[in-house]
């Protein structure tokens, strides 16, 4: 009988979990997942923050697709305050978040390939991610912690640079 620690991985890598394995030879007979390595005390910080500050606090919780973290409290505040979001703002939210979803899935595939021994796909996935991040930076003004969603809409309309980058990216992605 032997115990083996898998992890914990660093909180800014693609795994934030520790698993304690109980082995009998090479056979896993039990495991104990240990969660909580991503906890940053945001709940406590948000207790004394106004609504707009909460949005900026949740961005770093999932750095690969932080707009989704902004969306949850914004929707909750909008429901509590009975705020109607313009349709265009909803479309902009969906568009920007879906771009991050593509980026996130691309990174997942790259990391998975790296874990299986392939180096090239992770490099390709970072190239793809960087293009999407630069596109969103032209829209939001920031590369990682966007702080773009607002109660009642977004922090700015679609601009020419973003639309141009989006068109180029979509043309290339379609081939």
Feature-to-residue mapping (PLM):
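Active-site bordering "gate/hinge" segments
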Residues: 1-18, 22-175
């Amino acid at each position: 009988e032997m115990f083996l620690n898998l992890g914990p991985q660093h909180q800014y890598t693609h795994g934030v979990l520790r698993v304690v394995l109980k082995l009998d030879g090479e056979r896993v007979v039990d495991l104990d997942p240990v969660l909580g390595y991503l906890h940053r005390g945001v709940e406590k910080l948000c207790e004394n923050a106004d609504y707009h500050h909460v949005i900026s606090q949740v961005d770093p919780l999932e750095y690969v697709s932080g707009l989704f973290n902004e969306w949850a409290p914004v929707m909750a505040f909008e429901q509590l305050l009975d705020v109607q979001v313009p349709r265009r703002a909803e479309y902009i939210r969906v568009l920007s978040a879906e771009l991050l979803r593509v980026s996130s899935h691309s990174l997942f595939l790259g990391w998975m390939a790296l874990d299986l021994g392939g180096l090239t796909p992770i490099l390709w996935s970072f190239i793809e991610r960087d293009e999407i991040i630069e596109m969103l930076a032209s829209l939001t003004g920031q590369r990682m912690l966007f702080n773009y969603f607002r109660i009642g809409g977004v922090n700015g309309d679609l601009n020419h640079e973003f639309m141009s980058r989006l068109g180029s990216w979509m043309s290339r992605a379609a081939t």
